[in-house]
Amino acid sequence: MIFRVTYWELPGKERHLQFLKNYCLGAAVAIVLFDTTKASSLEKAENILKSIENCDIPIKYLVCNKMDLLTTKKNITNPASQQDADTIAKNYNCEYFNCNSTAINFVNPIYTSMTENIIKLIGTNLELRNLIGKNISVGKKLFNHPNFLQSLKDSQYFKD
């Protein structure tokens, strides 16, 4: 069985949001990141989630990035509220993860969850007819990412 993986990474600037729906239509997964050191970043993440709300994306993640900087950076004046992030994740039916900008082991659970949720969406009977209409598409960049490949190996659906 071969899966086509399409991965789009879009900048969070306002001028790029007008194209967001074009990329999200037909997507199986959306991962929206925000910078925990900036409350404005969480606000932008919420705007992105609002923008894609009608795109019928079955699997969504809200990821809080740069958790390590909260303890190492001294001049953070307006960090994002974890309570607000939890509320936003619940309001938009997102799984919520905290991520560290320097440690790879914080990213692995996101890839593992994404892979397992995609596989659940497809179902365990991996036939072409089960993929039709499920919007399963992952791009080369993500498919070749070591964390994504490891999550495939770690997934309960692909164990020997």
Please annotate each region the language model reported.
Residues 1-2, 57-62, 66-160:
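Conserved P-loop small GTPase signature centered on TRAFAC-class small GTPases
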Residues 2-17:
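Switch II (G3) loop of P-loop NTPases
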Residues 11, 37, 102:
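Adenine-nucleotide cofactor-binding loop residues
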Residues 13-17, 42, 79-82, 104:
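Structural motif corresponding to alpha-helix initiation and N-cap regions
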Residues 27-46, 68-76:
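Conserved Switch II/interswitch segment of TRAFAC-class P-loop GTPases
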Residues 33-61, 113:
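Amphipathic helical hotspot of TIR/SEFIR-family domains
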